[in-house]
Each structure stands twice: as C-alpha cells, then as structure tokens.
C-alpha cells in the first residue's frame, strides 16, 4: 500500500513539473527600431545660408526627433539660396527622386515675394510642389509638413524699405500656404512670429544680418517638434 501511494505521489510530481515547464511566459523579442528617411525641400532657409550644417533646421529637427525616440536619418536636402517656387520645381525634376520618404518638409516662397511675383502664381506653383511632396511620401499627408515664410522685413537688410508692406505681403503668401495645406490635412507650422522677433533680438540672425542663426532655427524646431510627433506617432 505504501508503495502504491509513493508511486502516485511521484507521478503527480512529474506531471506538475511538466506543467510548470510548459507554462513559462512568452517573451516577445524586441524588434529593432527602423530609421526614417527625410526629404527637405526649400530655399536659403532650408539649406541654412550662413550657418553650420549642424545648425540647419532640418538637421536639428532630425536630431531632435531621434532624441525623442523617433530615429530619423540626416535629411536629403534639395534647396538653394534665392530659389523661387518654379526654380524649386525644376530642381526637383532634375533630381529624379525615386525613393519614398517617411518625412517630407517644404518651405518656399520668400523669393517669390521679394521679386514681386503674384500671389496667384505662387498658389499655382505651391499646389504643384505640395503634390510632389505628397508623391514623395507615398501619398500620406501625415508625413508631409510645411513651414510658413519668415519675415525678412524684420532684419537689418530691410532697412529703408517699407517693412509694413513686406509683412503684409508675407502674410498674404502664408495665408495661401495655410489654405492649401489645411485642405489636404497637411501640417502647417507658423514660424513667422519667431522670425519677427529678430527686429529686437539680432542674436537670432546669422552674420549676414538677413538669414536666421542656428539659435532661431532651434526655436523653429521647438515649435515643430510636438506637432510633428503627434502626426508621426498616429497608428
């Protein structure tokens, strides 16, 4: 009888051991985080005229997003000082871009205003540029964003000119940008207010006293970051 009880106990112990082994929790392996590619389209503000490469706002933005847990590659930049909307369109065609990007930015228009181009022509070109940006993003508006045009009238370069007129024209262009981005559910970020602070704080300007300094670009990035994170983290 004792042998029978001992045999049963040993059998139960063996079964319990097997159950314990089978019930080990599943630990999901950590998937490596992918790094997003980024295309920045624009003019002197995007190429960072007068500042170091590391101070360009697209480069600062990529670094800030990476620090926030959204890894972004060093941006591919198609931009040049002095470009208008039509010149940027020509450059984009010449670049023959084949890739799809996780992030596409657009900042353009100041040279249209400076050269006295019409708002209507700006709108026509802007629509083409926005369509290109959407195409590069795989037609995902959450991956595209546009900045407002800075007000160069707040810089010493505008001394002796009608600053109020420049501001009104910049505002008119920015109104068009807001309309065209808003209708497509594209993020629009107003940095014009920050650019106007240069009127009383010239540390926000590069040595040429026309273009933003790395410090101003940092402020742009801080304005962009929370809004862009919300877009990029959408399921």
Feature locations, PLM:
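Sec-dependent signal peptide recognition
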Residues: 1-7
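Generic short amphipathic/hydrophobic targeting helices enriched at N-termini
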Residues: 4, 16-18
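Residues that line or immediately flank small-molecule/substrate-binding pockets and catalytic motifs
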Residues: 8, 42-43, 108
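C-terminal motif of bacterial Sec signal peptides marking the signal peptidase cleavage site
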Residues: 11-14
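Serine-esterase "nucleophile elbow" of acetyl-processing enzymes
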Residues: 19-81, 91-99
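Alpha-helical cap/lid subdomain in secreted, periplasmic
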Residues: 71, 90-235
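Active-site-proximal substrate-binding core of FAD-dependent oxidoreductases
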Residues: 87
């Amino acid at each position: 009888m004792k042998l029978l009880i001992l045999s049963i106990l040993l059998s139960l112990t063996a079964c319990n051991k097997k159950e314990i082994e089978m019930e080990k929790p599943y630990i999901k392996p950590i998937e490596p985080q992918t790094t997003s590619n980024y295309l920045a389209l624009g003019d002197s503000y995007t190429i960072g005229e007068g500042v170091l490469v590391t101070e360009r706002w697209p480069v600062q933005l990529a670094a800030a997003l990476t620090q926030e847990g959204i890894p972004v590659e060093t941006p591919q930049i198609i931009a040049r000082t002095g470009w208008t909307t039509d010149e940027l369109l020509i450059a984009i065609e010449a670049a023959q871009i084949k890739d799809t990007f996780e992030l596409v930015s657009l900042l353009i228009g100041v040279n249209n205003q400076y050269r006295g181009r019409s708002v209507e022509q700006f709108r026509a070109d802007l629509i083409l540029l926005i369509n290109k940006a959407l195409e590069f993003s795989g037609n995902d508006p959450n991956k595209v964003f546009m900045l407002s045009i800075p007000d160069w009238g707040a810089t010493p370069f505008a001394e002796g000119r009608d600053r109020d007129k420049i501001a009104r024209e910049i505002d008119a262009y920015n109104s068009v940008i807001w309309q065209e981005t808003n209708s497509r559910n594209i993020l629009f970020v107003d940095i014009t207010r920050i650019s106007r602070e240069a009127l009383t704080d010239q540390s926000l300007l590069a040595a040429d006293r026309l273009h933003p300094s790395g410090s101003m670009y940092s402020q742009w990035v801080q304005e962009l970051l929370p809004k862009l994170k919300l877009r990029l983290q959408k399921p």
